[in-house]
Amino acid sequence: MDEKELEKEITKNVIAYLSQDKNEEILAINKERIFLKLEKLEGMCNQNFLVSILEKNSNKILLQLVYKKFGIMSKTGDHLLESYIIEYLSKEDIGPKLFLEKKNYRLMEYIPETRHIDKEILFNERILNQLSLILETYNHFTSTYYYNIIDNKIKIEPLYDDNTTFKRINITKTYYDNIINTIFKKAKNSFNKFRNEFIQKIPLKGNEESHKILNKFKYYLDNFQENFDKFYPKEGFLVMCHNDVNRYNFIQKISDGKLYCLDHEYASLNLPGYDIADYFNETNFHFVPNYIFSFEQINYDKYFSKYKIYIKKFIESHKFLCNNSKGKNFIDFITSRKYYLSLHQIINYFWFLCCMAYLDFNSWYSEKKKSFYIAYDLIRFYEFGLEKLKI
């Protein structure tokens, strides 16, 4: 869909919303005397637009909304669960309000005078404290679950002795199951198609390194289950996680520095500490407007002390886990360096698979072999091998 078609689609959908909504603020708007102005916002996998509704005569802004058109990678997400989380976080005043949810797009509150977390202050103490509180709130969206994995199938059981006051809903979606039964299958199918076309159209002579990389990708996909199971614990406890904690999924009020959390399509039950490790992991990358990365930046050990501070807070709010030996052993495990590095392996493999799931030969070839997905896969592949040696 080109830009003009997309603008028409957005305008049509927003006008339809304005015509049906019963909100007093919207009812007061004369639909015959307005026009819409669209501004594209930063985003990695979705198309986000600031929609300003203006009065024709005065150009006065009557209302502003965020229109989010779901992108290709968001198809692996759960938009219904995401809408529940948005509602929950908005009540906690750490996320924008949801106005309308449809199959291909979403309308949300626009929070003015905000920006993404600046790269220079990612490890500012105030930022980390706010981030910790948001992730802790996230963890309490559902009950804590006990899980065990047998024959690549995960079984979960909610723990009802969690004496917190947060509202609970029943969740069955797990990160492990999403990877095993959804993303991996898509990655395998997509890669096989890509590889077949690559072999047919890219000669081996003169392209030996590219073919070598392709074979390495094939090896990690063929041995996915064996490799992944080395790092994902066979039993333990799960909490609700965001699973995509990078600076582009947070906005910060310019006036007071308050953080708001965005984009929850990857949310699911996952391992404690995953989100904070993901945040440390993603600080190595700069995605928009241009993809920038340096191998020399990777040093997960330097974040381990900050990870332990976060985990200490997690343990304090989940003291009930220490009521039995399984809980005590798991608490000891999640404070260890081995567990922390395993989280990074899991993170790297997850994004490796996500990129593989959306490989397209024609797009790759037309971009002169500089596809974002290929570059990102190379990084994740490199990291996986590097960190595997440490563990």
Question: Where in this protein do the model-derived segments appear?
Answer:
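Juxta-kinase regulatory segment immediately upstream of eukaryotic protein kinase catalytic domains
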Residues: M1-L38
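An alpha-helical support segment within catalytic cores of ATP-dependent transferases
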Residues: I10-E25, P158-N243, K253-S255
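A general structural signal marking secondary-structure boundaries and capping sites
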Residues: L18-K22, D93, L135-Y146, F228, ...
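ATP-binding pocket architecture of kinase catalytic cores
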Residues: E39-K185, K230
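Active-site acidic catalytic loop and adjacent metal/ATP-binding pocket
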Residues: L41-L62, D222-D275
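A glycine-centered beta->alpha junction motif in the catalytic cores
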Residues: F70-I72, N104-F123, H140-T144, N196-I199, ...
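Active-site activation/catalytic loop segments of kinase-like enzymes and analogous catalytic loops
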Residues: G273-S325, Q345-W364
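Helical subdomain adjoining the active site within ATP-dependent kinase catalytic cores
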Residues: L321-I391
